[in-house]
Amino acid sequence: ESYDLVIANHVLFYCDNLEKVCKEVRRVLKPGGRFLCSTYGNSHMKEISQLVSRFDERIVLSANKLYEKFGRENGAQVLEPWFSRVEWISYEDSLLVSDPEPLISYILSCHGNQNRYLLDHYKEFRSFVKKKTEKGLHITKDAGIFICNY
């Protein structure tokens, strides 16, 4: 089977072998088909990491910097050998967080070591985040999509 369009939304940085992924996408795309793959860059939501580091510098929200595997900064290099045209389109966006609870829930759900340091100090951390979000905490979104033509 072949397809006009293949979409990979924020998943390529989880793949062990990006060359194999690109080869398979090329195999299933019809001539003239497109591969759309979204990702983010190294500034994506950086304020959240800065926030937790200010509370406890030992906290790392993710042991892996996924954008280093496939992100805005290096995605074109990964894709260009496989596609005739690769274009990056930024998704202009940001967050203004004024309610600490969803932010705390997000932080606790990350794949890093935060629970080791935050769960025993949850009340302190909640107060810290509440104070930081009182006037709204701006969070940078550094995401977008690569459009690849076959």
Please annotate each region the language model reported.
Residues E1-V6:
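A short acidic, Gly/Pro-enriched loop at the edge of an enzyme's catalytic core
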Residues A8-V11:
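A short beta-strand submotif of the Rossmann-like class I SAM-dependent methyltransferase core
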